[in-house]
Amino acid sequence: IATVDCSDYPKPACSLDYMPLCGSDSKTYSNKCNFCNAVVDSNGTLTLSHFEKC
């Protein structure tokens, strides 16, 4: 199972780096920062499906 450490999030701004991750909501997040901010917003219900785009 792929995991991402989001313990130091949320962050107020994310870089534009493109390193896509696919969330359990079948949405592609452009990088770890955007994904982790979404995890925080979801109260931890969002998880990582896999690395790369969905």
Curated annotation (Swiss-Prot):
GO terms for molecular function: serine-type endopeptidase inhibitor activity. Disulfide bonds join 6-36, 14-33, 22-54. Glycans are attached at residue 43. The record marks 16-17 as: Reactive bond 3. It is found in: Secreted. Keywords: Disulfide bond, Glycoprotein, Protease inhibitor, Repeat, Secreted, Serine protease inhibitor. Coiled coil: none annotated. GO terms for cellular component: extracellular region. InterPro entries: Bifunctional_prot_inhibitor, Kazal_dom, Kazal_dom_sf, Prot_inh_Kazal-m. Pfam families: Kazal_1 (PF00050). Residues 4-54 form the Kazal-like domain. It comes from the Eukaryota. Avian ovomucoid consists of three homologous, tandem Kazal family inhibitory domains. This is Ovomucoid. It comes from Vanellus spinosus (Spur-winged lapwing).
